[in-house]
Regions:
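N-terminal Sec-pathway targeting helices
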Residues: 1-18
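Active-site-adjacent loops and short helices of periplasmic peptidoglycan-processing enzymes
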Residues: 2, 31-209, 219-221
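Domain-terminus/edge residues, biased toward the C-terminal soluble/receptor-binding domains
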Residues: 9, 29, 184-185, 200-371
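Enrichment for repetitive, rod-forming helical segments
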Residues: 13-18, 22, 107, 364
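Hydrophobic alpha-helical membrane-insertion segments, chiefly the h-region
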Residues: 20-30
Length: 371
């Protein structure tokens, strides 16, 4: 019997481990609602979440859910670091110029806003929409950042990327490192301007959930958040160049039409459709929203309607009732082993309207000795 156990010890351990995971997932499937829960990306060592973040789909609540055009949607509470609403929010999607949100914060954190940037032929040759930078000429980093974030100029994004990263490839590496650092494991960027691209690894993409976390970091958590907000809240920006005076206008309509939007970035490519990511502050709450594939020509205004619907939903009673129970599995590095598994069961805590705050069970299985 002892010989048999030793011979098959590793297989037995594997079977036990699989059974434990199966039980965790099985418990999850019994929950009646799936909705607002901690984003796994915020735990950098997360392996996977046992459930997709979606609003509970039952007859009573369907009536109150926002009616949206976007293919992929996320609504995020930046203070609780939880999701209020999700629709296909973990799907890998082309995200167009919303990429420039991360381009901007990486540039602000890695370079001086008063740097002088010399324009390459590569940057000058970027397609519309563009400022019309002249190869060989020099521009101020600050002016390029405003051009990129207010007017979404593609040549400005490339000029910034080459200056900060040494090349667009080098800058893409910095972007992906930052995304990973803040927990956005569903994001992979290739271009600094968000134009569709692919390489041997993957295609240029993010998720609605990740983009909310990226915007939350940029607006409130980065050491350069103040500069980021100053740029993205500016309605009009004027500066002088060798080519004459330049005037940039902000295309974020929610800044003009609401009193709660504090930052945002639009985007469009044929593949991505119309996209929009925003940071808002309403009724004492700090939130981010993300809309991907929100219509194609001639439906340019869908994103504004969807954004407003999401914000109204966020402060409604319907959103307060959409919390859920959830189970998750995460890795934890303990000592010299990376084979420690944490299983956490999280109970709905409706009494104080907070979710994923109380761990009823938090037990650890160290499988490092079995494999």
């Amino acid at each position: 019997m002892v010989i048999f156990f030793r011979k098959y010890k590793s297989k037995i351990a594997l079977m036990v481990f699989i059974c434990v995971l199966f039980c965790a997932v099985s418990c999850l499937l019994d929950f009646k609602t799936l909705g607002k829960q901690k984003m796994p990306g915020l735990e950098k060592k997360s392996v996977f979440m046992a459930a997709e973040n979606t609003v509970a789909k039952n007859t009573d609540k369907d009536v109150n859910e926002p009616r949206l055009h976007a293919v992929s949607v996320a609504l995020y509470d930046a203070d609780d670091e939880t999701f209020i609403y999700g629709k296909n929010m973990r799907d890998s999607m082309a995200n167009a110029s919303t990429t420039k949100i991360l381009t901007c914060i990486v540039a602000l954190e890695k370079a001086d806003i008063n740097d002088t940037v010399t324009i390459s032929q590569n940057a000058a040759s970027q397609p519309e929409v563009k400022l019309g930078l002249v190869a060989g000429n020099s521009y101020n980093m600050k002016d390029l950042l405003y051009g990129m974030m207010l007017e979404s100029f593609n040549d400005c994004a490339y000029a910034i990327a080459e200056h900060v990263g040494g090349s667009t490839e080098g800058f893409a590496k910095l972007m992906n490192e930052k995304a990973n650092e803040i927990g956005c494991l569903g994001t992979y960027f290739i271009t600094p301007n968000g134009l569709d691209a692919e390489n041997d690894i993957s295609f240029h993409h993010s998720t609605a959930g990740d983009l909310c976390v990226i915007m939350s970091y940029c607006a409130w958590k980065s050491p350069k958040s103040t500069q980021f907000l100053e740029i993205t809240q500016t309605m009009q920006y004027t500066f002088e160049t060798k080519e004459g005076q330049m005037v940039f206008s902000n295309h974020n309509r929610l800044l003009k039409e609401t009193d709660y939007c504090i930052s945002g970035k639009t985007g469009f490519t044929t593949k991505a459709g119309y996209c929009y990511v925003a940071a808002v502050e309403k009724d004492g709450r700090r939130m981010c929203l993300s809309l991907l594939g929100c219509g194609w020509p001639n439906n340019k205004n869908y994103k504004w309607a969807d954004a407003k619907s999401l914000v109204e939903y966020a402060v409604s009673d319907a959103a307060e009732d959409s919390y859920c129970d959830a189970a998750c599995v995460t890795t934890q590095q303990t000592g010299d082993t990376r084979n420690t598994i944490n299983l956490k069961y999280i109970e709905n805590n409706k009494k104080n309207k907070k979710i994923c705050k109380n761990f009823l069970k938090n037990f650890t299985i160290n499988i490092g000795n079995f494999f």
